[in-house]
């Protein structure tokens, strides 16, 4: 999905998204089965987001993402038709929005007081996931260096 499609389709905060990823706490003996998580686009920032890697392009989604979900494709779902126990998705109304990058968490400390003060640090997932937009993936895949590398391999 390009910026033009996002504008044409009026993609905005509140639009439904979903992704499929692993749930590390659940695994089977014969095969690992992915879980599907649903949410909504929460913010499409107009500027880059500060990160340890430097400023990056991100989209924010209101959904739970945990370790094991990074790299999962995230889809934008226009107007799902729900039927008992199923979700029917219209063919051209499903678009790749990006790739799951991670999640945001709240840092905090807990003081325990009876006789001794013990300070425990914790990180709590706040329910906002970070998505690398598909436009960024397109830029990387079709960068001059990678195009030349693919051409020289042929």
Regions found by a protein language model. Name each.
Residues 109-154:
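PDZ/PDZ-like groove recognition
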Residues 21, 38, 43, 96-107:
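Short beta->alpha transition motifs characteristic of CBS
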Residues 2-30:
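Short glycine/Trp-rich loop-beta-loop segment that forms part of the substrate-binding cleft
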Residues 29-35, 47-56:
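Gly/Ser-enriched beta-turn/beta-hairpin loop segments
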């Amino acid at each position: 999905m390009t910026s033009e499609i996002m504008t044409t389709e009026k993609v905005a905060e509140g639009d439904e998204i979903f992704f499929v990823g692993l749930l590390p706490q659940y695994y089977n003996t014969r095969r690992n089965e992915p879980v599907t998580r649903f949410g909504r686009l929460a913010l499409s920032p107009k500027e880059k987001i500060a990160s340890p890697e430097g400023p990056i392009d991100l989209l924010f989604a209101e959904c739970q993402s945990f370790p094991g979900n990074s790299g999962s494709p995230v889809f934008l779902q226009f107007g799902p038709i729900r039927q008992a126990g199923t979700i029917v998705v219209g063919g051209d109304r499903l678009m790749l929005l990006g790739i799951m990058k991670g999640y945001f968490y709240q840092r905090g400390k807990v003081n325990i007081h009876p006789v001794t003060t013990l300070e425990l640090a914790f990180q709590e997932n706040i329910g906002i996931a970070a998505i690398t937009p598909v436009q960024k993936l397109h830029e990387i895949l079709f960068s001059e260096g990678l195009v030349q590398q693919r051409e020289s391999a042929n």
